[in-house]
Amino acid sequence: MRSAIIVSALASVASAARPYLNEPDTGIDEVLGQLPVGSLPNVTDMHALHDFEWAARRYLPKVNYTYYRNGAGGEWSYRNNLEVYNRYKLRPKTMVDITNIAESMPTTILGHNFSAPFFICPCARAGYGHPDAELNLVQGAGAGKILYIPSSFSTLPIEQIAAKRAPDQILFSQVYTNDNDTANQILFDRAEKAGSKALVWAIDAPGSPSRQRAARYGVGSANAVFITNTWEVLDKFRTMTKLPFILKGIQTVEDAKLAVQHKVPAIILSNHGGRNLDGSPSSLEIALEIHREAPEIFEQIEVLADGGVRYGTDALRLLALGVKAVGIGRPMMYSNVFGVDGVKRAVEIFRNELTNDAANLGVADIKKIDTSFVDWTPNHWYS
């Protein structure tokens, strides 16, 4: 009898195992699932950012999709990036005049004007999604008047990407550095000559990550050496270029404080999309830590963030803490399978979602959103 109870209990636990989802079931399989694998639906059938992942997963060769999708280790940080937002309930405010919310969306980053507080993150190898690679991303960002940050490991050279900019379009350039300052100088000079207005230094990848999913398909990390990323190196790099450095990969309040002390103009809270160190915190958790222990940082420097953002409500939680703009990575790479039209649609989907979610939250001016719009007591959903 006792053994039967134990077996029954174990079976109950197994049947109650938590789901592991990339996207929710919104009926897309029922409506579009008859399409042959390896083909694409109409881009107008994409209604949310997660729809682009569904399309890319069915369309791309497994190796290509895996490169974009993979995370480090057991992929807990990848999953946590997606799920952390819903651990904090929103607090909608009613009887608010929100009719000017769309007009409040434009923002600045390092003094440059953009149409909305979100941007396309640096992601490597856009050529895995489409032959035109990063050209689609730069043109899609230009059409939407948002920031695009090409990766150091782009399929195409920065010169070719920059040549496709719209008039007055602003680009920043991500840089991975190494201990060869001759190579670093060439990298900085190329970005500057191509017209980049800032260097986004990836400081969270000093070693090679453990990406088992990527290794399985032969698409491991582009980084394979140990690199010296220190404040002393930052001081040296500043003598090598006129461009400002944004530090991408800040994951603790202590490092955010040091960035302020070292007069860094902006930081990006990021765990590299869960691709570098499994167990690293999400950008929302980092922003919460900063807000609780040193909220003045959000006034002292510009704080950006990326990781797991799929919905307008995700971005609103980050903006409520003081984050100035929110980065989107994988969904934009998935949208690239449709070419420039896919990127344009992804940008507009997210813009519309962010604007309408802000209105439904009772935010009259996106720049005035604050912590009162979120219940910051975690509900422990999937924690």
Annotate the PLM regions.
Residues Q139, K164-P167, D179-A305, G312-N336, ...:
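Alpha/beta enzyme core
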Residues A143-A183:
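A gly/proline- and charged-residue-enriched helix-loop-helix capping module
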Residues M1-R18:
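Fungal secretory targeting signals
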Residues K89, P106-T108, P117-C121, L147-I149, ...:
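Short, conserved beta-strand segments within well-ordered enzyme catalytic domains
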Residues N113-L156:
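Glycine-rich active-site/cofactor-binding loop and its immediate structural neighborhood
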Residues P61, G339-V340:
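Glycine-centered helix-coil hinge/cap
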Residues R18-L110, G220-A224, T228-N229, K368-I369, ...:
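An N-cap/entry alpha-helix motif that binds or orients negatively charged groups
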Residues V340-K367:
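Internal helix-turn-beta structural module
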